């Protein structure tokens, strides 16, 4: 390495060490990883754009790092002066550079997280962030802990065999990084991991370093900005890419680890292959709530695409299995089946690469698997032709139409191998394959359908109006129930082709007809958002029957807003008391609770407590009626939308509310963090399985009555304070839209769904995602903390003994600890100084006191929270996360300053800036700017501003790791 390069590298390392001077564990290599990636990136930047750009990037970084050390707001203004003097081309290059550096920092963290040993001495329960997952047990530790609690291995195994975790990948991919970049990020992560492996040869190291530089340059040269809004089909393909990359192979690998962990506590038996500990569902192409782009045709497309992908993934594996199972010894059943298939096989299969000639009877397993291969090939072709042409000439009898048809020959081979003394062989690739079949079926994922209750009301209103019996919409709840039940008990058809239909009604009915047409095993639940009453559920049951769905989907009400959560138990009581409905559900019911809209409606603390209570109430109602209830947690990736670390968030749920059956959303913005890399995928599967098992066998204790009373009191104050600002202050919407990039959010083309449920209107019409996203961008996180400070202050000033009680709650009650620690993590990521800069530049003078008061509330809430947690500064008890944030902050701060000054220039054309000479080393000073303008020829703003703004949004989202 040349001396100049050594000096640059040492300089970068020194700067990072100023921010994070101490290692947090023996195996802490985060600063080394960061320094290597940053050094390679800056070298690439210099080679592409010259030393002037590199020096400016480093100068901006140093100003931002100085601000992070001193919090002197003059440094922000100095940053602003440097940034506004850049010309359009340089501005985009430098904003893109900081966004890239944040992505690289995240990749360094993922590598560190995937490989570091656990820090044993960290204080128990410090679980502020997913990435601090020190207290998140691996599966083997969970089993050992349960055995230490005097739970027998047999009890643990029996409980495990009866549990299922269904992970639901959501349709609105708030994942703001393009798939093209995610793949390049994967290569960077792999190279970095291998570079630090033991016993790496000098040649390997050099080649890996070159590969790393190629991947970094390829990522930097890829346009970060989606120029076209993704369709629901695009979203689905992106979600499914994780199955290709990690999940497909990750599931059998994880289940094998479960077997090993069980063996280590004395269970000499494997988890049965047909026990699906993990299942996967999706909303991609099924979630039509507020998204007019999800049509019946889209739903049909994504179902057929998923079936084609599933058949293809099985097909690509079956040849390896045929190579492995070359044995001749078998039982009589396998021999007879092989002879039968052999006699039916007429000709060679020239479209196969391996085993294309007729397989001899001396290889019976291969004969049987050859028939499985033929059917998989035909299954794939059948789905492909239906998808491409709308029809298929592949005979259905030559395909797999049901999972039992697929599993049966595999089971036959498995049992024969075991009976022939070859169980070790049976428990190899064949067992892995059977576990994949049990987990993924023929559909890869089960598609949930989600629609808002009002759309079903429109359909029913069209029907009753056409029948001449009045307007369903104007009927009371009692009259609606009476009519729906009379129709459900009867058999007459409700409507025919002469039913007058609006576009919305036709779309809703078209969805039910697609459900009737497609294979039933492709679908999961039919979820009704904004559910408020039993008639919402009965209407969907009736529409399923009317449209000819032979095996109706289970109907799941989703309770979201505070008032709906409060009345959820009463609604389910009324439903369970209806004989027709009780017979229909056959003793099982699923209810979904929404974290996003409840938080937007009432504030995070109130929503969290109401969600806790509603689960207790619903479980009690279900017990009274002899119904097994599954809770479906609609958690967002961000704290404002119910996000947080998996293991402890689940363990903080009320006792008896999981019961071995759990559904939970994996939101778009955390899919990459959960499944983007092999080790991350493994940890995700491990966390959910371990937490569900632990909650079932060793449930958390219930809160004391006095704790409940205090929470009730604080929830009332929180909601009152939150709503007094967000919903009742007449100029709040004006302030919100001035002080955040909410108005510009739609330009990001993040997902296929509109940002609003309805055009116009205030905060109540805004979806929870852009609401959270906008405040995350300004580092103010208002929806998470607003109201908390007022609640803490009220109860402590009312009686100082309440402070001691709050401290007891924090130390003894997992729900309260999780809630407080998540708040603390948000305060660690927040910065009221940055938020003040947005106000200074973007908000009218008469609205500025609004922001000043909110920042006082922020600091007050933080003060009380730290007092309750017994910490001097945020994250005192979590050095690992504190280190991560310190290393990340200078990048994020630079992007914040970029963003606020760009917003100022967009919104205020009279804002004057003096542009200095072009820095980038292009042949022509205007060529880079011209090229970048060509990427966005329709922008209504001066050259470079719109792209710079979007790049800052993406970068800050990467820095916060909560895009909304």
Curated annotation (Swiss-Prot):
GO molecular function: phosphoenolpyruvate carboxylase activity
Residue numbers carrying Phosphoserine: 11
A GO cellular component annotation in the UniProt record: apoplast
Pathway as given in its UniProt record: Photosynthesis; C4 acid pathway
Keyword Cell division: no
Top-level taxon: Eukaryota
Gene Ontology BP, a term: tricarboxylic acid cycle
Disulfide bonds: none
Coiled coil: none
Keywords from the named record: Allosteric enzyme, Carbon dioxide fixation, Cytoplasm, Lyase, Magnesium, Phosphoprotein, Photosynthesis
Catalytic activity annotation: oxaloacetate + phosphate = phosphoenolpyruvate + hydrogencarbonate
Subcellular location: Cytoplasm
Cofactor names: Mg(2+)
InterPro entries named in the record: PEP_COase, PEP_COase_bac/pln-type, PEP_COase_Lys_AS, PEPCASE_His_AS, Pyrv/PenolPyrv_kinase-like_dom
List of catalytic residues: 172, 600
Gene3D superfamilies for this protein: Phosphoenolpyruvate/pyruvate domain (1.20.1440.90)
UniProt-listed Enzyme Commission number(s): 4.1.1.31
Pfam family name, one: PEPcase
Ways its activity is controlled: By light-reversible phosphorylation.
Protein family (similarity comment): Belongs to the PEPCase type 1 family.
Subunit details: Homotetramer.
Record function comment: Through the carboxylation of phosphoenolpyruvate (PEP) it forms oxaloacetate, a four-carbon dicarboxylic acid source for the tricarboxylic acid cycle.
Record's protein name: Phosphoenolpyruvate carboxylase
């Amino acid at each position: 390495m040349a001396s100049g390069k050594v000096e640059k590298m040492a300089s970068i390392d020194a700067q990072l060490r100023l921010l994070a001077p101490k290692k947090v564990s023996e195996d802490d290599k985060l600063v080394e990883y960061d320094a290597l990636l940053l050094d390679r990136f800056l070298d690439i930047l210099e080679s592409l754009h010259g030393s002037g750009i590199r020096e400016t990037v480093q100068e901006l970084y140093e100003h931002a790092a100085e601000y992070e050390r001193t919090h002197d707001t003059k440094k922000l203004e100095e940053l602003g002066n440097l940034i506004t003097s850049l010309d359009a081309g340089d501005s985009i290059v430098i904003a893109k550079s900081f966004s890239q550096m944040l992505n690289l920092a995240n990749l360094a963290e993922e590598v560190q997280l995937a490989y570091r040993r656990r820090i044993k001495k960290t204080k128990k329960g410090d679980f502020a962030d997913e990435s601090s997952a020190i207290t998140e047990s691996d599966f083997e530790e969970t089993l050992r802990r349960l055995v230490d609690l005097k739970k027998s291995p047999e009890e643990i195994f029996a409980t495990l065999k009866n549990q299922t975790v269904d992970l639901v990948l959501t349709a609105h991919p708030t994942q703001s990084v393009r798939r093209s970049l995610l793949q390049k990020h994967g290569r960077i992560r792999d190279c970095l991991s291998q570079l630090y492996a033991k016993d790496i040869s000098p040649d390997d190291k050099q080649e890996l370093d070159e590969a790393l530089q190629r991947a970094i340059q390829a990522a930097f040269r890829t346009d970060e900005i989606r120029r076209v809004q993704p369709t629901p089909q695009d979203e689905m393909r992106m979600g499914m890419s994780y199955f290709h990359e990690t999940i497909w192979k990750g599931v059998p690998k994880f289940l094998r680890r479960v077997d090993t962990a069980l063996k280590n506590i004395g269970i000499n038996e494997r988890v049965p292959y047909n026990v699906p500990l993990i299942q996967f569902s999706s909303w991609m192409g099924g979630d039509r709530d507020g998204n007019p782009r999800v049509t019946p045709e889209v739903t049909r497309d994504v179902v057929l695409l998923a079936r084609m992908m599933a058949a293809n993934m099985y097909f690509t594996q079956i040849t390896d299995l045929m190579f492995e199972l070359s044995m001749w010894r078998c039982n009589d059943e396998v021999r007879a089946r092989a002879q039968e298939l052999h006699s039916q096989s007429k000709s060679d299969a020239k479209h196969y690469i391996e085993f294309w000639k007729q397989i001899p009877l001396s290889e019976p397993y291969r004969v049987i698997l050859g028939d499985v291969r033929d059917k998989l090939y035909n299954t794939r072709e059948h789905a492909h032709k239906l998808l491409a042409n709308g029809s298929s000439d592949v005979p259905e009898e030559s395909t797999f139409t049901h999972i039992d048809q697929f599993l049966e020959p595999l089971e036959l081979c498995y049992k024969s191998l075991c009976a022939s003394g070859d169980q070790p062989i049976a428990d190899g690739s064949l067992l892995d394959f059977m576990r994949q079949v049990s987990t993924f079926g023929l559909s890869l994922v089960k598609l949930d359908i989600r629609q808002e209750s009002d759309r079903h009301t429109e359909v029913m209103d069209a029907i009753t109006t056409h029948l001449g019996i009045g307007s369903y919409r104007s009927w009371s709840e009692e009259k609606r129930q009476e009519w729906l039940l009379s129709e459900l008990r009867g058999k007459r058809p409700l409507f025919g082709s002469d039913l007058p239909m609006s576009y919305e009604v036709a779309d809703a009915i078209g969805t039910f007809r697609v459900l009737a047409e497609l294979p039933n095993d492709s679908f999961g639940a039919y979820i009704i958002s904004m559910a408020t009453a039993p008639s919402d559920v009965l209407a969907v049951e009736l529409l399923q029957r009317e449209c000819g769905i032979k095996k109706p989907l289970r109907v799941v009400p989703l309770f979201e807003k505070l008032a709906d959560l409060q009345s959820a138990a009463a609604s389910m009581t009324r439903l369970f008391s209806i004989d027709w409905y009780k017979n229909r559900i056959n003793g099982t019911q699923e209810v979904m609770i929404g974290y996003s809209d409840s938080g937007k409606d009432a504030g995070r603390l109130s929503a969290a407590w109401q969600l806790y209570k509603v689960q207790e109430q619903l479980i009690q109602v279900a017990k009274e009626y002899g119904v097994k209830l599954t809770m479906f947690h609609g958690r967002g990736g961000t704290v404002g939308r119910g996000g947080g670390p998996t293991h402890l968030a689940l363990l903080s749920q009320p006792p008896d509310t999981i019961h071995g059956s759990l559904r939970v959303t994996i939101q778009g913005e955390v899919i990459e963090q959960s499944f983007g890399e092999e080790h991350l995928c493994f940890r995700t599967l491990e966390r959910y399985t371990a937490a569900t098992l632990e909650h079932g066998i060793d449930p958390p204790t219930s809160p004391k009555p006095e704790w409940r009373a205090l929470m009730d009191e604080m929830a009332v104050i929180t909601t009152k304070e939150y709503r007094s600002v967000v919903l009742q202050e007449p100029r709040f919407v004006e302030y919100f839209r001035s002080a955040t990039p909410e108005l510009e959010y739609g330009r990001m083309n993040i997902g296929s769904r509109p940002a609003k449920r309805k055009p116009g209107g205030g905060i109540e019409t805004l979806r929870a995602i852009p609401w959270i996203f906008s405040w995350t961008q300004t580092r103010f996180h208002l929806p998470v903390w607003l109201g908390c400070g007022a609640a803490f202050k009220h109860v402590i000033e009312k009686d100082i003994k309440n402070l001691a009680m709050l401290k007891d709650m924090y130390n003894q009650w997992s729900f309260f600890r999780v809630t407080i620690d998540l708040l603390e993590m948000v305060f660690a990521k927040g910065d009221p100084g940055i938020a003040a800069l947005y106000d200074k530049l973007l908000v009218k003078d008469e609205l500025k006191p609004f922001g000043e008061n909110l920042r006082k509330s922020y600091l007050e809430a933080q003060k009380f929270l730290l007092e309750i947690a017994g910490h001097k500064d945020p994250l005192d008890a979590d050095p690992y996360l504190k280190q991560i944030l310190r290393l990340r902050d200078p990048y994020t701060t630079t992007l914040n300053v970029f963003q606020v000054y760009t917003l100022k220039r967009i919104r205020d054309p009279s804002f004057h800036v003096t542009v200095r000479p072009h820095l980038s080393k292009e042949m022509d000073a205007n060529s880079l700017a011209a090229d970048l303008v060509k990427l966005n020829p329709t922008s209504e703003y001066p050259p470079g501003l719109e792209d710079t703004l979007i790049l800052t949004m993406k970068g800050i989202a990467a820095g916060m790791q909560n895009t909304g």
